[in-house]
Amino acid sequence: NKIKVTFDLLDHGDIIMYRQDGRVHFSRIIGKPGESIEIRNHHLYRDDRRVNDKYAKHRQINNIALRDIKNSDGDTIPPGSYVVLNDKDSDKSDSRRYGLIDKKNIIGDVSLKYYPFKEFAYQF
């Protein structure tokens, strides 16, 4: 679905499909342009406020800061860039490997998930 990308409607928790290093990847948005992101002691912080976010709480990721991410020049996500994480900790083909994800590399957001069947979901 390209509507959210085209009209800058991508939000936290959205799963996006993007191109990086000649491959297509799927990851979840945890940080948007203008925000500061950090994971400390298994908790996600956005703009220095702790976020009740299930994507950081039970993860193997202990600490990560925006300034430590590849292609990041500071503590704030620049315009047109996103920070993403995969739902599986073992798959590090997300911002931990590629750094900031440029909007021009985003193909769209995932609006239908059908496998595994018990996690069937859709968005409109």
Predicted segments — roles?
Residues N1-F124:
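Soluble "head" domains of membrane/secretory-pathway proteins
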